[in-house]
């Protein structure tokens, strides 16, 4: 058992990206923040499933080529091997929770030839 305040951790890119509160041994738990117009590389996981819960703001999450606009209070579950791309097309930062399980040290497969420009506004 442990208790942690999110302020004890830092976002990967200063004011954005994931902030992992827990990495393993069975799951990853992160608070994720994207600034306006910021995105994250299209990718998939071979083993892990990923879940996002939107804490504040609005974000577009593209799963297997279908764009889903999510807002505060929305939840999305992404299965292994589903290519997903996250982009904040809006004027306010987005803050969400990300949970990945089962924990894998390396399970992110970036999709290099993905046409992400079609999903940017």
Task: Kindly label every feature range from the protein language model.
Residues 47-49, 54-59:
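Glycine- and acidic-residue-biased ligand/ion/polar-headgroup-sensing regions
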Residues 25-27, 58, 66:
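Well-ordered beta-strand scaffold positions
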Residues 39-41, 60, 76, 80-86:
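Histidine-centered metal-chelating micro-motifs
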Residues 25-27, 47, 91-92:
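Short strand-connecting beta-turns/loops that link adjacent beta-strands
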Residues 30-45:
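Conserved short histidine dyad/triad with adjacent acidic residue
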Residues 65-80:
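Short acidic-glycine-tyrosine-enriched beta hairpin
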Residues 1-28, 108-121:
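A short, N-terminal "cap"/entry segment at the start of jelly-roll beta-barrel domains
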Residues 80-106:
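Ligand-binding loop in jelly-roll beta-barrel domains
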């Amino acid at each position: 058992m442990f208790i942690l305040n999110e302020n004890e951790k830092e976002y990967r890119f200063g004011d954005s990206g994931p902030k992992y509160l827990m990495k393993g041994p069975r799951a990853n738990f992160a608070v994720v923040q994207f600034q306006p117009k910021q995105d994250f590389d299209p990718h998939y996981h071979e083993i892990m499933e990923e879940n996002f819960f939107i804490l504040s703001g609005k974000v577009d999450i593209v799963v297997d080529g279908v764009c889903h606009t999510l807002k505060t209070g929305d939840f999305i579950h992404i299965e292994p091997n589903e290519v997903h791309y996250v982009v904040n097309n809006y004027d306010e930062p987005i803050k969400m929770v990300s949970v990945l399980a089962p924990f894998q040290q390396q399970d992110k497969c970036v999709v290099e030839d993905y046409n992400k420009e079609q999903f940017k506004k």
